[in-house]
Amino acid sequence: MAQTTVTVVATKRDALDPYIKILQNRSNDIDVSFSSYLKPDNNEQQQKENEDTELSIFEARSYFSENGSNDSRCQTRNLSGPRFSSVASAKVSSFTVGQTASSEASWNSQTGLLSNKNRQGSDRDGRRSSKKGPRWFFRRRACPCSSSKSVQVQESKPRIAVPKTGSDRIVSNRIVHSHQTISSPEPIRLTIPSNTVTRSIDYTANKEARAPVSNFSFPTLNETSQLSENPKNPVLNHIKPVRIEPALLPIKPVLNPTSPKGVIIDEEATSDASSDLFEIESFSTQTAARPWAPPVRDSMEETVSEYGYEPSEASVTWSVMTAEPASAVAANFSRIALSSSSTAFSGYDKKRTGLLNCHCEKAVMVNGDKRLVQPVKSVGVQNDVAGKVLCNNGSSKLSVTSRPRQ
């Protein structure tokens, strides 16, 4: 049997997978010299020789088996692509061959070890993932719902609004009642002696409502609430006011002193009342007694203080409403300013007399330099004459004197 030499050559393609080529050189058939490569050979013979000399991995294993049988025919197979096999690399490394084969086999063994490590890591990951499943289903400790960090939320009951009790309402009513009681002014006293002709009405002095005048002043009553004990008997009646037009020049009222009704003049007020402008507002029990009346200046003191005692070249608006159109009683006063709001007097059940039930026969309206006398359709003549007196203590007294009808 001819002597053969086997050379294991491991080459790297793309630095990934080696493959082994087994070359069987026969001294008789193959020329090993360098010149032999320069000689042209037949292609068919070379292909056959290559097929005979190239062996696959499995054929090499069977070739180097312990039996040592050489009966099997050597076959060569061309490997078209790279092939990786850790088992083959491990087997090749155990071969007892030359230095070149051992170095290549050692490199192959390293790649095999690396691949085995990767396989072990993947196996461990698979085992871990397989262990997590039964722990989740069969062990409640691993469930996050029952761990110490779990949070349990309980549904809170909706808040129910507590209705207000009767005590709260009583307290609020008390507060309102106390507020109304504090804001109410003092009542006005009415003194009417029985079986007498002269009746007097005393008004308390109101220091805050007084307007400063050079000579003297009268108090102005504020709006007061109804304080009557018998509300069914209204004390005041409506007096239709006269529409007032502004006058270009201030004119003093000219009244007829020869009135058939007579005149009562108070001695205390005759000194200063003859030269003062005045205005007597209507007496009413309701605030809506004269809704159409234009706004009238409440006091003449502003004009007096600005232009002196007797204003000149100032527009003055004034009107006269008295019990008698030709009466000179109103000329004795500077001003009678009473509130047009509802005012009730307590303890009055007698017959209404005086200015409280006064309907004027005629009304005087002054416009410029002319004096117009305008009759009123609804006329109720009373035999009463009013007079207002300034007292020393600062309070005013309104005296009503009854006279027989003529």
UniProtKB/Swiss-Prot annotation:
Keyword tRNA processing attributed: no
Effect of a null allele: Reduced phototropic response. Altered light-induced deviation from vertical growth and decreased phytochrome-mediated inhibition of hypocotyl elongation and cotyledon opening. No visible phenotype at the level of leaf flattening and leaf positioning. No effect on negative root phototropism.
GO biological process, one term: red or far-red light signaling pathway
Induction text: Down-regulated by light.
Keyword Methyltransferase belongs to the record: no
Classification via InterPro entries: PKS
Keywords annotated in UniProt: Phytochrome signaling pathway
Superkingdom of source: Eukaryota
Segments of this protein annotated with the region Disordered: 106-133
Tissues in which the UniProt entry reports expression: Expressed in the hypocotyl elongation zone. Not found in the root elongation zone.
Polar residues bias spans: 106-119
Note: PKS1, PKS2 and/or PKS4 are essential for phototropism but not for inhibition of gravitropism under long-term blue light irradiation.
Main function: Modulates phytochrome-mediated control of hypocotyl growth orientation. Involved in PHYA and PHYB signaling. Acts as an inhibitor of asymmetric growth. Not involved in the control of leaf flattening.
Record text on subunit structure and interactions: Interacts in vitro with PHYA and PHYB.
Family: Belongs to the PKS family.
Protein name as it appears in the record: Protein PHYTOCHROME KINASE SUBSTRATE 4
Lineage of origin: Eukaryota, Viridiplantae, Streptophyta, Embryophyta, Tracheophyta
